[in-house]
Amino acid sequence: MDELRLERVGIVAHDVGAYVAQTLAREHRERIAGLFFFNCPYPGIGRRWAEAGHLIEIWYQSFHQMPWAAELVGSARAACRTYIGHFLRHWAHDPHAFDDDLEAWVDNFLKPGNLQGGFDWYSSVAAARLAVIREQAPPAPRIELPTRIMWGRHDPILKAEWTDRLPEYFRDPEITIAEHAGHFVHYETPDRASAAIAQFFDRVPW
């Protein structure tokens, strides 16, 4: 923000980006006008991350911490396509939503350092992630900023029912369930997502 000479901003974030946005909101509240999230992980999910029926969905979070994981996935274009393609198909409501763009995703992940950089995130937050699952994380102050959340109904990794505790962590959050989307609401329903973002930031106090 300083580098871009932006004194105050609105933030749009999804999944991993939501962790960053929540930290910014708690540490630099005066510089954030509002928060807009798609499928937002937050501490209130707690032990549900590791429920018996959900363990099969989070295996990759441990796999990414293996020192050879990026090398294995990036060992061949076909391997990378199979790996990344699995998540795009499985997490989207329409498994064909990314068919036209899959090769672009593979191109990006095969650039030097991109797989390892992404996988390193999981190593860097491993202790904090386990603390949340064990419900031993330090209390997180409630975010007192205008917040809007669109959550895909059919997301298998961040379940729509996990919106239940959002009001404990955000003041009066506006929560909308996107009935025809999975994990990638902004990609699966781009027109609706773009309109919601614009409408939200048009009315937050700047």
Stretches with model-predicted labels:
Residues 181-190, 194:
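Catalytic histidine-centered segment of alpha/beta-hydrolase-like enzymes
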Residues 1-12, 16-177, 186, 198:
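Flexible "cap/lid" subdomain of the alpha/beta-hydrolase fold that forms the substrate-access gate
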Residues 196-204:
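C-terminal alpha-helix
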Residues 97, 203-206:
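Conserved donor-nucleotide binding/catalytic region of nucleotide-linked donor-dependent transferases
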